């Protein structure tokens, strides 16, 4: 029998004590059965002033606990080790249990059983120092008691893994009871609340709707949680960066911004950015069109795919905004002037030139400025005899710049040819492909590396699956545009997870006679 301990501070007046519960992993019955499970506790209850380790043989004392949860987000696990997300906001009347009917059904059954149990009728309340004789006198007090009952249920039926507290501790009407037991949830006679959860990318959103259509509220919890695109488990955002944006549950590599990638690859204090003052304009006067094209994504339509389309690409706000406005919006959102960061630094002491694309900036689309910055970086690396790294994360050529964006493919490829062959300097270019790498980027510099490295399960393609199927009227096998099958076909040299990536690239450089600068000075 596995025991799970729950320690919490309980207070009433100036008295403070700790209650400890043990729970069988196999029990998911009514809450009144918990008395038989607590089998290793002391029979005598010590005085509150003498000990903090008070033990109980009934659940009655536990029900008197007020304000256990008021505005919290919980990641919980039941006795079957199934994970659920529970959000409670009593002030705003929101209660959500992960959209799982079976779990809500279990909660409803146990709550009814608990409410009608003999514990309320047969146990003497006069002997309980924590019993409030006004608890059942009014409807409002009864609602408070219901909230306490549910609190007790949650404390005894689930194992709390992690939580976020907001500091509010005020109960209101028993909308939690209504949500669980279905009373009043859809009533037309009283105010009705419904809760919807939605996930897009890595964002968690909970929407509350009332009978008043103008009174919908949406709360975004992406500041706290990151949802894995593969297993849909929650990752705590505060610790996610230290995990290199890798899901702790399944090891899936989620998207990583350019600044974090620079921090991952470049030694601290050695990063020197280049050409930060270069920004895009509207070279073909895209916004002056009389009848502008309604765009679905910010990449060339031939390259578009559901995995590449931007999250904001479907919103009316972005459809109606101009190209310059979208650039300004991306600059504010990312803090970057363009969809790539270029510069120099040291990788394990080895001087390198590096460019890292930023997918959150208009889908990492390649326009004139992106092409110019990459070309200048290549020229600088050639003149300084530096190895070159380009980290690709792009939806392809930027359609708002028309043929000028397509020209960047030839421009960069030509610069790489001079860098690797024409100069006879035997320089070394490593291409690192991340998800997604598509379109014009795939058709140019992404596939021209001396060594081509890809992250696990990255989406790498020229035309997207949907476009191929609609154009050629043939089915594209699921997963055929991922890293692993491309590696098996010989299109990639290495598949390297983020954890050892820096050391792997460092060893490749040393094999090609690029050594740390301090060793070079000694020689």
From Swiss-Prot:
Keyword list, A-Z: ATP-binding, Chloroplast, Fatty acid biosynthesis, Fatty acid metabolism, Lipid biosynthesis, Lipid metabolism, Metal-binding, Nucleotide-binding, Plastid, Transferase, Zinc, Zinc-finger
Documented EC number(s) = 2.1.3.15
Q: For this UniProt entry, what is the primary localization, expressed as one broad class?
A: plastid
- Write the protein's name: Acetyl-coenzyme A carboxylase carboxyl transferase subunit beta, chloroplastic
Binding residues for Zn(2+), per the UniProt record?
Answer: 228, 231, 247, 250
Q: What top-tier enzyme class does this entry carry?
A: transferase
Q: Where does this protein come from, organism-wise?
A: Cucumis sativus
Subunit-structure text = Acetyl-CoA carboxylase is a heterohexamer composed of biotin carboxyl carrier protein, biotin carboxylase and 2 subunits each of ACCase subunit alpha and ACCase plastid-coded subunit beta (accD).
Q: Which terms does the record give in the GO molecular function aspect?
A: acetyl-CoA carboxylase activity; ATP binding; carboxyl- or carbamoyltransferase activity; zinc ion binding
Task of the protein: Component of the acetyl coenzyme A carboxylase (ACC) complex. Biotin carboxylase (BC) catalyzes the carboxylation of biotin on its carrier protein (BCCP) and then the CO(2) group is transferred by the transcarboxylase to acetyl-CoA to form malonyl-CoA.
Gene3D superfamilies membership? 2-enoyl-CoA Hydratase, Chain A, domain 1 (3.90.226.10)
